[in-house]
Regions:
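Hydrophobic aliphatic residue packing
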Residues: 1-2, 73
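Plant-biased detector of terminal regions, especially N-terminal secretory signal peptides
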Residues: 13-14, 64, 123
């Protein structure tokens, strides 16, 4: 195992920061997989947790009470702390906990208006050690040049021209 520095002034080394293992290629009974090249682990396309969180977010955004859905998720995860009221911060935190390292955090932050603003900062956001806001055009991806070349009616997203 690599010795890692949790606190760092640079992000250039392989052993800087934390590492997390979420998925492992073992069978549910703990035995090795049948073929080392191909995983035996199923990949969920849509999880029940995503349905609960999507509904909770919709209810919250319409001014309703989303505590039932959040507490149901927490119950399934053996979390004993129930929420009494759901806030925007509670929702974005629940999305982060439930889908940690599953590749959807950026879209969640964009949807909550936190990706480019100083409403939510992380180390090295915007190239600053303690984080800083960045230009709002980063909320969208650039359109591939090949797509633009194939469609004269299409133009590049602002900020990427």
């Amino acid at each position: 195992m690599y010795k890692r520095q949790i606190q760092t002034d640079a992000i250039s080394g392989f052993t800087d920061g934390l590492s997390i293992v979420k998925w492992q290629n073992y069978r549910s009974d703990g035995k090795p997989v049948s073929h080392a090249t191909y995983p035996d682990t199923d990949i969920p396309l849509f999880r029940l947790a995503e349905a609960y969180l999507t509904r909770a977010e919709a209810i919250f955004r319409q001014g309703g009470d989303a505590t039932g859905d959040i507490n149901e998720l927490r119950k399934r995860a053996n979390c004993t702390r129930k929420v009494q009221t759901v806030t925007e911060q509670e929702l974005i935190d629940e999305w982060a906990r439930e889908f940690y390292l599953e590749g959807r955090r950026r879209s969640d932050l964009v949807r909550f208006g936190m990706f480019t603003t100083n409403k939510y900062l992380w180390d090295w956001k915007g190239g600053a050690m303690n984080g800083t806001s960045v230009a709002s055009y980063y909320n969208k991806y650039p359109i591939p040049v090949s797509d633009i070349n194939n469609n004269r009616n299409m133009s590049q997203n602002e900020g990427y021209k």
